[in-house]
Amino acid sequence: MKAFIHTDWWDVLKPEFEKPYYHQLHEFLKNEYRTKNIHPDMYNIFQAFEWTPFADTKVVILGQDPYHGPGQAHGLSFSVLPGVAVPPSLVNIYKELQDDVGCTPVNHGYLESWAKQGVLLLNSVLTVQNGVAFSHAGKGWERLTDVAIQRLSERSTPVVFILWGKAARSKIKLIDTQTNVVLQAPHPSPLSAYRGFFGSKPFSKTNIALTSFGEQPINWQLPEHVNLEH
């Protein structure tokens, strides 16, 4: 099988790509991309694994499925491409970021700089039909991303897992909480942010944990201007 993830995640996940469930998912996706408008672009499906290698992952921010509007999703949870309006959940993340660690909000939602510092921005489902949230749930992606979470949890170097909302928090069963740090809060969506997301201080808590592991803290301040890599 020719590698289609070009980092050490390939070795971690390759056994999954050889299993029947993934072959079924692959056939489903081929038909979906051929006949419908699917996000993200097929070349960006595994972008989170490309930008944040397994050995470099220090933090995981878990999402559900990609944004389902045109031109938003590019393979990272919560992140959108430059030139697209910042989605409401990310607006609230920026509010908490400013309140927690004093970061100045930016007018884009492109979280590449976090990913390149070791923040794995992982959705549990990696594709979605345009305009239809959760349309690719239950097709097999969850099995693959659950394995990614488990392998990180088992790693000798600990990881900070940030779980926002009920769906993300259900993944705690995959994580060894004795050796890793888990930060839980309500989802940053406008529907739930006031129930405890605001004031949860995930960014400062993450950096305290990383420092205790002997790791470099994350610089959460996003650049004011971003350029797409080609």
From Swiss-Prot:
Q: Which UniProt keywords apply?
A: Cytoplasm, DNA damage, DNA repair, Hydrolase
Reactions it catalyzes: Hydrolyzes single-stranded DNA or mismatched double-stranded DNA and polynucleotides, releasing free uracil
The record's annotation in SUPFAM superfamilies points to: Uracil-DNA glycosylase-like
Which GO BP annotation is one of this protein's?
base-excision repair, AP site formation via deaminated base removal
Enzyme active site:
65
UniProt cross-references to SMART domains, sorted A to Z: UDG, UreE_C
Annotated compartments: Cytoplasm
Q: Which InterPro entries match?
A: UDG_fam1, Ura-DNA_Glyclase_AS, Uracil-DNA_glycosylase-like, Uracil-DNA_glycosylase-like_sf
Q: Tell me the domain of life.
A: Bacteria
Classification via PROSITE patterns: U_DNA_GLYCOSYLASE (PS00130)
Which cellular component terms (GO) are annotated to the entry?
A: cytoplasm
Q: What protein name does the entry list? A: Uracil-DNA glycosylase
Report which gene this protein is encoded by. Answer: ung
